[in-house]
């Protein structure tokens, strides 16, 4: 594929044009009076959204240099979304402001590397100041406020706060589409995994189609069980205790399954068999989690344990196990709290070391099942377009609320960045191009609050000057046009979201400013194919 190359000012301006097109489409969504953007889909109905990263992902430009510029800014939105789950619009606006001011100075003769150094130092100081400003989330109401702002709906915010309150900060909050209208919160106590009973004959509650075992023994096996002679010695021991038996294994089949089913139907012995969740190493790890949660051991030949010689003390215990056709819930496992805590910290370390998003997500699920609970928010709406938009907003708001719990909250509405810069720049001692770089950051930090004001029909410059002279934490409530104590009135942002947005924007801005050449694929010139004739004298 032939390439085209642009140098110096031409290269940077091409990138900037692409960035501006993307940023201008994204920034109309910022603030309580931000607008929506409609995204055309090749198949199905269009999507309506005000989520920065969703809009950014859809933008594909024709000009090769502009396309690269847009892709670089997309990376800001994606990275911020990955780290904090929200703040993508703020990150895009900050990147645009930093690049615009930076390129102006480069064109005027400033050294790009000096500017980059100044930007990095200033951003580090502002990030430190944001951390100092951050207040810990102490109440359910504060979680509700930050989630409400992200979702633009106080009912959603309240529901998310309730979900996080129930499952704890390590718990999982998932969002699912529902066939019914409105919002619904479903809580799961204990550990739940997505595997149901192997045979419907295990059902004990015919109305609900559930197998419910009270105070059961739990056999956890990392292999298939098919020969009844392997299982029989253990079945006899469990029968003598009068307790039911839950079996979690790779599979239960053949005469072993038939024996369990026949005894259940006759009322001789109550049991339920479930396939182990996951595959390969992940299955092994999940079975290990279940064993620690229930105080049992995984029966596996890898550790020298055979099924036929298993004793009762190797089985797990729980207050109750509920098995449906699709999922199994273990309620109040009898595991040792110290061992569970050890397993939790081990999984946390694995999450920190993991490079793969997929692995991290799966580890996070395992952590939640061990340390917290699972809350499912079910979303329903009148149309598919509204349903997708609502679901997306709720997912963003859940990430936002979790980020608030993690690193605390700061004043919202772009005020935290502006006020952090006032204090941070008092301590900076830079000269030359580095001082110019720091000044670029100071000007860029006004961009989010100016955009919120603009989207609300106010004059950005006037709002910035007014907020500069207010006490820390006070600023514009763009929804009402009043200047208030933002934290007191619940207009807050998670510190993690604000910090990530600034750091990711500065990272890309530095790359923009130090770019001296851009190499892109040469656009192909495809002449339109000739239209075939109508057939002339041909016989059909």
From Swiss-Prot:
Keyword terms of this UniProt record: ATP-binding, Chaperone, Cytoplasm, Isomerase, Nucleotide-binding
Annotated localization: Cytoplasm
One GO term (biological process): protein refolding
Function, as annotated: Together with its co-chaperonin GroES, plays an essential role in assisting protein folding. The GroEL-GroES system forms a nano-cage that allows encapsulation of the non-native substrate proteins and provides a physical environment optimized to promote and accelerate protein folding.
EC number: 5.6.1.7
CC annotations in GO: cytoplasm
Gene name of the record: groEL4
Superkingdom of the organism of origin: Bacteria
Annotated protein name in UniProt: Chaperonin GroEL 4
The protein's assembly and partners: Forms a cylinder of 14 subunits composed of two heptameric rings stacked back-to-back. Interacts with the co-chaperonin GroES.
């Amino acid at each position: 594929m032939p390439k085209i190359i642009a140098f110096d000012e031409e290269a940077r301006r091409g990138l900037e044009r692409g960035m501006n097109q993307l940023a201008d489409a994204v920034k109309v969504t910022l603030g309580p009076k931000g607008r929506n953007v409609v995204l055309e889909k090749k198949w199905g109905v269009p999507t309506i959204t005000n989520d920065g990263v969703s809009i950014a992902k859809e933008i594909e430009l024709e000009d090769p240099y502009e396309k690269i510029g847009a892709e670089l800014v997309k990376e800001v939105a994606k990275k911020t979304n990955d780290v904090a789950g929200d703040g993508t619009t703020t990150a895009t606006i900050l990147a645009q402001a930093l690049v615009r001011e930076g390129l102006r100075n480069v064109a005027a003769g400033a050294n790009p590397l000096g500017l980059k150094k100044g930007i990095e130092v200033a951003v580090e100081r502002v990030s430190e100041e944001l951390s100092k400003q951050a207040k810990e989330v102490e109440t359910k109401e504060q979680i509700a406020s930050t989630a409400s702002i992200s979702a633009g709906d106080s009912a959603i915010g309240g529901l998310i706060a309730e979900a996080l309150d129930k499952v704890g900060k390590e718990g999982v909050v998932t969002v699912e589409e529902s066939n019914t209208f409105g919002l619904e919160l479903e809580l799961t106590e204990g550990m739940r995994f997505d595997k149901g009973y192997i045979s419907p004959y295990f059902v004990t509650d015919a109305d609900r189609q559930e197998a419910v075992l009270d105070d059961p023994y739990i056999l956890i096996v990392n292999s298939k069980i098919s020969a009844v002679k392997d299982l029989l010695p253990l079945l006899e021991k469990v029968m003598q205790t009068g307790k039911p038996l839950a079996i979690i294994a790779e599979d239960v089949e053949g005469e072993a399954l038939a024996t369990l089913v026949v005894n259940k139907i006759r009322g001789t012995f109550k049991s339920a068999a479930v396939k182990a969740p996951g595959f390969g190493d992940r299955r092994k790890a999940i079975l290990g989690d279940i064993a620690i949660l229930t105080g049992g051991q995984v029966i596996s030949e890898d550790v020298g344990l055979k099924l036929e010689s298993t004793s009762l003390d190797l089985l797990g215990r729980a207050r109750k196990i509920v098995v449906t056709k699709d999922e199994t819930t273990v309620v109040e496992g009898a595991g040792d709290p110290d061992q569970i805590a050890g397993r939790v910290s081990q999984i946390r370390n694995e999450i920190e070391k993991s490079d793969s998003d997929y692995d991290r997500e799966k580890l996070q699920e395992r952590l939640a099942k061990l340390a917290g609970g699972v809350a499912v928010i079910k979303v329903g709406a009148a149309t598919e377009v509204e349903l997708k938009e609502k679901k997306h907003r709720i997912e963003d708001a859940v990430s936002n609320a979790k980020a608030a719990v993690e690193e605390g909250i700061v004043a919202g509405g772009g005020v935290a960045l502006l006020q952090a810069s006032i204090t941070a720049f008092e301590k900076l001692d830079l000269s030359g191009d580095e001082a110019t770089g720091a000044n670029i950051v100071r000007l860029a930090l006004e961009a989010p609050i100016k955009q919120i004001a603009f989207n609300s029909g106010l004059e950005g410059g006037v709002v910035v000057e007014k907020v500069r002279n207010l006490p820390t934490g006070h600023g514009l409530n763009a929804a009402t046009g009043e200047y208030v104590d933002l934290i007191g009135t619940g207009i807050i942002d998670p510190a993690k979201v604000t910090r990530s947005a600034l750091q990711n924007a500065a990272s890309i801005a530095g790359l923009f400013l130090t770019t001296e050449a851009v190499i892109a694929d040469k656009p192909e010139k495809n002449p339109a194919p000739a239209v075939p004739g109508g057939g002339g004298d041909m016989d059909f």
